[in-house]
Amino acid sequence: MTQNQFDAIVIGAGPGGAPCAALLAKGGLKTLLIEQNNRAGGKAMTVNKDGFTYELWPVTGGPMYNSRFEEILAQLGLSSGLTEHTIHNAMYYPDKNGVYQAYVSNRPEPNTPPNPEAMMAQMKWLGIDEEGLEAIIRFATETAALTPYDIDQLDDITYHDYVSRYNLPTPFYSMLAMQSNIVYVVPIDQVAASEFIKTSRDMMANSAGYYSKGGYGRLFERCVEAFEKLGGTVGYRTRAEKIIVENGQVRGVQSNNGTFSAPIVVSNAGIQPTVLKLVGEEHFDRGYVNRVKDLVPSLALMGTRYYLNKPFFKEAFNIAFSDDSYVNTERSMRAKKGEVPEELLIFNVMPSNFDPELAPSGKQCVLSSTLCPADPDMPRTEDWWRKIDGMMERIWPGFSECVESKETYGTRHVSDLTREQVLPKIGGECIGLGQVVGQCGKHKPAAAAPIRGLFYVGCDAGGYGCGTHQAVDSAFNVADMVAFYHKMHG
């Protein structure tokens, strides 16, 4: 990079940074995007090996239709990235004998109302009796009647406390708890009811399970390609070392590849690494620093990448859960103390079942995972990986016979790739800040930092929703904020 003076610098080409940079360039700002890795995508990065194309761990998004994913592509003049697979997903729940049984769903069509027959089949699969069904109907009816104002009043109530009003059947509660774990990667008795209900409405109206042609990370690679065509400058393998601040005003970024000047910096590195390391505590008041240090991350995913000698699963992704395997606060605390659960919730994604081009003919890659603490140095990882192997074979007999090779991954891998550890036991989180009570809605950290010209983008500020969709939502919102700031101060 020969030039070093820009209108704005975006740190990180993840699901928040890459779309935000593209939108800024489209708006006419001379923008630099720096990324410490050799490609875009962040936690949703897509890689290639031995003919397989896959993410480093399971990634799907939502909503599937009318999404911010498709909106960013349209804004950049790009074609839809939505895959056209057939068998969408399967959920597995144990019967009375402890044998996991499947409930399979085909790829949903857009603008299709809920199917009452399918809903009843799901209740039968869960073993819900008539009394339980009445409680579920009352819960669903009253929740559907909530206005946006009503939902906003639930920022300080956990989803567990909200649903506990209805005396729901245990299997149905377990399914809701599983959804809290998979969509938000936090315990059901911590997730804010407002966030859960608002995002669930988006999913109900437009389905879940978004995946991009060419791999999930391909969506963000395309954003960067468009960014470059719009005149943006990209620096891969460029690690931000310091955000330069003088007299309360951003001046630029110091990196391993030189120093770049700009009056605006947008950080996709996470609010805690940005404040505590890239900027430095000395530039903020003590109350703000304490608030940032107190922010709680989501839980993490750890697991195994299995490379199979033949296709084993037909569905594009699946989730196996039970009354004993979803993660609540009590179970999470036991795991943080080093206990390996007897029963694990399992989340698998099969990229080539979304897009057949992502695996060699006659083979399959299975990205398997379970929830765990976010500590990059969590203990007993080998025991967790062995437990995952055992759960995979127990739930899906014959699976292990198809495994040609495998690779394990854990919280240290996540932290090293995407989020530097700046506080004890934090850094390996799956999403970023947890969407828990005290950190959602009116309590969400502001995207504009208390330093002139500094903004946060991604899952930590500026958006709402499910994982990567929250990050892209943030990209739109923060790009608008930055454009306005530039107009006022440029």
Residue spans for each PLM region:
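Dinucleotide-binding Rossmann-like beta1-alpha1 core, especially the glycine-rich loop
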Residues: 52-132
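C-terminal segments that line or cap access tunnels to active or ligand-binding sites in enzymes
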Residues: 308-416
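Helical element adjacent to the flavin cofactor pocket in flavoenzyme catalytic cores
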Residues: 199-250, 255-256
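Rossmann-like flavin
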Residues: 96-193
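Mid-domain catalytic core of redox enzymes
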Residues: 241-359
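N-terminal Rossmann-like FAD-binding beta1-loop-alpha1 element of flavoenzymes
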Residues: 6-33
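A glycine-rich dinucleotide-binding beta-alpha-beta segment and adjacent secondary-structure elements
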Residues: 175-183, 398-464
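Glycine-rich FAD pyrophosphate-binding loop
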Residues: 25-49
